């Protein structure tokens, strides 16, 4: 940026008269020019326009931004010049402006006004609203690259975004509309992609302008949304599970959009925080702005430098679904890490690992200070970022493969919970959590195990505190559920703790029935608590927690949690029935609690049975799929291993080297595909069936260990088949 200079400009003190004279007499010359790194830009009406906007439009914007933010010593020249020209434009008489040749008129944005009437231009898409009686709700709400953005309101109060062309970008809105039409026709509409209606003539100030109309998404951009979400996490308004589960929900939605675009053969090319808007009403993320789209394999019209995939800057590699996947992950990284606070860090550079020094520095109170883009330990999150941003295009997963990554398939929360969290984030209705948000550690589980053993010892001596042990068990169920989701405790320790909990329930049941040890001498006194006190302090909190659990959507990984909750309800019923039989008449309050416990147990049993049946069905499908792979699995595995061991290393350099590398890769791919040619259809059909099943099975630990083994075998076979299926479209 040190080479920036102003060329052909008037002094900062240029008068309005001089500005008028320059406009009228020297229209053929640039009004003001910048020269940045040998590239020329014009200063027009307080805007800087690249003379060739299709060669890195966003790249120049970053550099010029420094001039107008006061970071350059000579920024005042550009500012004063454009302020003066702006004033001259406003005060120039209509007669003078009409004499200005079209070239200069267009330079100042004064393009000829359309003669078409207000309303749709041509046939709008199906479902488009009636524009009769429309009015301008907001003008220039924000500017989007090559467009002005205004909000139009119909007589039915529907708000539409009007994307209006600037003169320098004439024709790009029609191309964008054609892209949406193509997507809708070939792949259909998508709830997380902007809903476009067509081109229309709309009011804009005292003019009429042609605009691309689409539904307004009322909400926040990605950076603001995730920054507020992170603040809620830090303030204890949501816990770690909710925060990361919501991040994963967003990632799944965005990758579903890139997969949808790929089905239509379209690449977005400009997914970034500013082009993802979160709907305040639904909590859903919506991808907008197809202005820089291309067809798969074509060179992109442009991109945002700090987010783009590296292959788009080397040789002649075209845009692809994988470059859009790269954009999704760099966008998420930017928002999660808070890169907007440090513009020198680029999200497409990925995470930087530091092992020679602490990844976090401490403040004066000894608390860690987050350093954006720095990782000191490997986690599923860091592996996800590295597996997509840190590999070449041929090794990068596509949308469906990325969704199968351990980071996105483990520790998820149900969609409705994630959307509610986002809606609360957008409306500012988050309330602090009262629960402990710290992670469950192995030490914590050992402490809880020791507490259970103490209760078991008390039972052996007929001194069991029934209320105390049931209250502790309720707390331990929550802790074990959380530990299983977080994945920070060894699987064997989790299994041991689960067994100890179930054993404690059996001991309580025997104790209540008077069969602990020598049943002939056992006591039937189960608790010093009065019935009412027991129900209010022990039964009620457990019922409320389990009822919330029942209202959620569950996956196979929740079966263990539901089994434990079912056992807890059974034990509470057993204890309460026994208390009710000790001499005094049963009160209406006790009947009420017994009925609520019984109803909750029935509902839980139904949900558990349904989930177990679905798991059995999935297990049967899994077995069938693995058997189907028998005809091709060994041949495909060996062919892929040979391809990986013989293919040349990716070279980055000149166009010539890139072309040579692609030729060599194509040759190796052709040999590999020939080896498995008779199984191509089988493998393609296999992945169509296996990928949805793998998403359903997830990556979390399951109670059925044999099912886990079969699931991982299916995952390996799917990876082999999917990679071979991609070879032709990637290299040939």
Curated annotation (Swiss-Prot):
SMART domains: S_TKc. SUPFAM superfamilies: Protein kinase-like (PK-like). GO terms for molecular function: ATP binding; protein serine kinase activity; protein serine/threonine kinase activity. Its EC number is 2.7.11.1. Residues 136-408 form the Protein kinase domain. PROSITE patterns: PROTEIN_KINASE_DOM, PROTEIN_KINASE_ST. It catalyses: L-seryl-[protein] + ATP = O-phospho-L-seryl-[protein] + ADP + H(+); L-threonyl-[protein] + ATP = O-phospho-L-threonyl-[protein] + ADP + H(+). InterPro entries: Kinase-like_dom_sf, Prot_kinase_dom, Rac1-bd_C, Rac1-binding_domain, Rac1-db_N, Ser/Thr_kinase_AS, Ser/thr_kinase_yersinia-type. Keywords: ATP-binding, Kinase, Nucleotide-binding, Plasmid, Secreted, Serine/threonine-protein kinase, Signal, Transferase, Virulence. It is an enzyme of class 2 (transferase). It is found in: Secreted. The active site is at residue 270. The keyword Cell inner membrane does not apply. ATP binds at residues 142-150, 163. It comes from the Bacteria. Acts as a virulence determinant. Belongs to the protein kinase superfamily. Ser/Thr protein kinase family. This is Protein kinase YpkA. It comes from Yersinia pseudotuberculosis serotype I (strain IP32953). The gene is ypkA.
């Amino acid at each position: 940026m040190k080479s920036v200079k102003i060329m052909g400009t008037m002094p900062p003190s240029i008068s309005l008269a001089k500005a008028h004279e320059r406009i009228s007499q020297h229209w053929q010359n640039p009004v003001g020019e910048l020269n940045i790194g040998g590239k020329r830009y014009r200063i027009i009406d307080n805007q800087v326009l690249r003379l060739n906007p299709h060669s890195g439009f966003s790249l120049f914007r970053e550099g010029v931004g420094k001039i107008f933010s006061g970071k350059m010593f000579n920024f005042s020249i550009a500012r004063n010049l454009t302020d003066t020209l702006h004033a001259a434009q406003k005060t120039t008489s209509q007669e003078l402006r009409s004499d200005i040749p079209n070239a200069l008129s267009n330079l100042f944005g004064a393009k000829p006004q359309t003669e078409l009437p207000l309303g749709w231009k041509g046939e709008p898409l199906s479902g488009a609203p009636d524009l009769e009686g429309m009015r301008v709700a907001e003008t220039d709400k924000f500017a989007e690259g090559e467009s002005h953005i205004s909000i139009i309101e119909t007589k039915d109060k529907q708000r539409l975004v009007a994307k209006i062309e600037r003169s320098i970008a004439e024709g790009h809105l029609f191309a964008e509309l054609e892209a949406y039409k193509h997507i809708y026709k070939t792949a259909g509409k998508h709830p997380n992609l902007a809903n476009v209606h067509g081109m229309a003539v709309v009011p804009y100030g005292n003019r009429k302008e042609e605009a691309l109309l689409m539904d307004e998404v009322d909400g926040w951009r990605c950076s603001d949304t995730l920054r507020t979400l992170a603040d809620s996490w830090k303030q204890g308004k949501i816990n770690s599970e909710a925060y990361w589960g919501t991040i994963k929900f967003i990632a799944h939605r965005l990758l579903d959009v890139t997969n949808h675009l790929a089905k239509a053969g379209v690449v977005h090319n400009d997914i970034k925080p500013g082009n993802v808007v979160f709907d305040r009403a639904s909590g859903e993320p919506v991808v907008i702005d197809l202005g820089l789209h291309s067809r798969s394999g074509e060179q992109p019209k442009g991109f945002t430098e700090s987010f783009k995939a590296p292959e788009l800057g080397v040789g002649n590699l075209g845009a692809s679904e994988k470059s859009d996947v790269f954009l999704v992950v760099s966008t998420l990284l930017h928002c999660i890490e808070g890169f907007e606070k440090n513009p020198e860090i680029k999200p497409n550079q990925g995470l930087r690992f530091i092992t020679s020094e602490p990844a976090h520095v401490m403040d004066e109170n000894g608390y860690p200070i987050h350093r954006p883009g720095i990782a000191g330990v490997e986690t599923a999150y860091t592996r996800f970022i590295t597996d997509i941003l840190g590999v070449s295009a041929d090794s990068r997963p596509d949308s469906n493969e990325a969704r199968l990554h351990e980071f996105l398939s483990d520790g998820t929360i149900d969609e409705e919970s994630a959307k509610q969290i986002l809606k609360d984030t957008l409306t500012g209705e988050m309330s602090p959590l009262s629960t402990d948000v710290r992670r469950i550690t192995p030490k914590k589980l050992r402490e809880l195990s020791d507490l259970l053993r103490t209760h078991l010892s008390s039972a052996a001596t007929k001194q069991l505190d029934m209320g105390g042990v049931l209250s502790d068990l309720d707390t331990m169920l929550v802790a074990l559920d959380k530990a299983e989701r977080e994945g920070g405790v060894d699987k064997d320790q989790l299994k041991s703790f689960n067994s100890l909990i179930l054993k404690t329930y059996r001991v309580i049941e025997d104790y209540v029935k008077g069969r602990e040890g020598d049943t002939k001498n056992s006591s039937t006194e189960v608790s010093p608590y009065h019935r009412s006190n027991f129900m209010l302090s022990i039964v009620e909190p457990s019922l409320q927690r389990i009822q919330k659990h029942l209202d959620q959507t569950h996956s196979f990984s929740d079966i263990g949690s539901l089994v434990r909750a079912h056992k807890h309800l059974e034990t509470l019923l057993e204890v309460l029935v026994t208390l009710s039989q000790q001499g005094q008449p049963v009160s209406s309050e006790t009947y009420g609690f017994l009925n609520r416990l019984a109803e909750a147990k029935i509902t839980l049993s139904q949900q558990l049975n349904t989930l177990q049946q679905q798991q059995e069905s999935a297990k049967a499908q899994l077995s069938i799929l693995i058997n189907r792979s028998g005809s091709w699995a060994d041949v495909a595995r060996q062919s892929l291993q040979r391809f990986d061991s013989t293919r040349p290393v990716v070279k980055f350099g000149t166009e010539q080297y890139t072309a040579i590398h692609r030729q060599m890769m194509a040759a190796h791919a052709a040999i590999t595909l020939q080896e498995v040619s008779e199984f191509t259809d089988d493998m393609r059909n296999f992945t169509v069936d296996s990928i949805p099943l793998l998403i359903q099975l997830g990556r979390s630990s399951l109670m059925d260990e044999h099912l886990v083994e079969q699931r991982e075998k299916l995952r390996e076979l799917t990876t082999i088949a999917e990679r071979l299926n991609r070879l032709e479209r990637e290299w040939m």
